[in-house]
Amino acid sequence: MKQVWKRLMAGVLAVMMMICMVPELTTKAASGLDTQMVFQCGANVTGILDITGTLTLTGTGSTFGADIWYSRNNLWYDDENDIEYQYRINRVVIGDGITSIGDSMFVNCTKLNSVTIGKDIKTIGKWSFRNCVMLKSIDIPGTVEKIDKGAFTESGLRTVTLHTGLQYIMSGAFEDTALTNVTIPENTVNVETAAFGESVKNITISKGVAVIQSYAFPAENAYVDVLADDVVISAWAFGEGTTLKGKAGSAADRFVKDADEGYYRFEARPITVVFNANKGSCQVQKKSATPGEYYGTLPVPVRKKYTFAGWYTSKTGGAKVMNLSKVGNDNHTLYAHWKKVSVAKAKKPTVKSTAKKKAKVTIKKVSGAAGYQIRYATKKSMKGAKVKATTKTSETLTGLKSKKKYYVQVRAFKKDSTGKRVYGSWSTAKTVKIR
């Protein structure tokens, strides 16, 4: 009888051990790793926390928000065993299909240091990552449209990457963090009051950003690059001493001018001046210039058989621009204007044989001429003629043949913008008999 009883008890114990092992086998199969805990995180969202501290959320739709009891986050609390799993979560992976992160969901998860956000998340809820002090950086994908109130306040964030698609950054979203730099992505609709903390001192407002509310960036002596020319900036949006860089005449420029004198500074964004040589050539094709300042040194283009007439605002006509002209607010092109080199035909020179084998040539001045050429020969056809250049209107020819008749012509030349000579027509020949 005792033997039967022992066998019966052994069988019961074996069955009980198998029953106890079922949950462990199930969780291993579900996660691929040993599982610490499985959580119901939304109506259709499940969270599995493995032994490495990685919490993987899968499912569809929104997650639950969390109730906070003092420092305890009840979403991650196992009241049956009195275990606060919030302190065991090191990494969060939010799968595709999940559309929002609930309010206060990860509050006080003080060991959390990595968050991967799925491609379907549209909203990051209020206070969702508050006091996640080990979370140093996060990349928020462009599918996220709204970062709600206080979402990352008092977290350890040092860097955040925001993408085009984000619409709203609500009050306190990044307040009391260690962020120092931030770029507000293109077409963001609204950056609310106190969205960022006093450590953020390098700010870029991208094109298409619509509204920056009062005290959105309270840091003093910050530097803001405003690429959105028409952004609405509310009074006191930035801390005292902040420099705003933007297009001259833009909303940023007006904002600084409307504020108390000296409270902010404005730095005009340099514009680009393009030089169009207009059938000529120019070594300098563009330069950077500051609106409201002088153009300063301008390049000098060149063109064969033309002189440079200056830079103008239009290809034909327009206003002339010189070194001391003031630069406008927008990128623009200046066009070279040209004057064709025209040299008048020289008049017949006066030629006299003043001594043996010599002749003096007197040239009637041609307006604007840089110099002259004298051509002389013993044949009327000028075959075998010699040519002499001069910048004077009187020149003596030497080494001529005595008793010979010479034909003498002159022509003027000017120099074009390349420095080369452009000649006029030869004059009528003057004859002279040499002594």
Segment roles from a protein language model:
Residues 8, 52-60, 86-100, 110-123, ...:
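Structural signature of tandem-repeat unit edges
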Residues 103-105, 125-128, 148-151, 170-173, ...:
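Consensus positions within tandem repeat domains that build extended binding/scaffold surfaces
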Residues 391-395:
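Short S/T/G- and acidic-enriched coil/turn segments that sit immediately N-terminal to beta-strands
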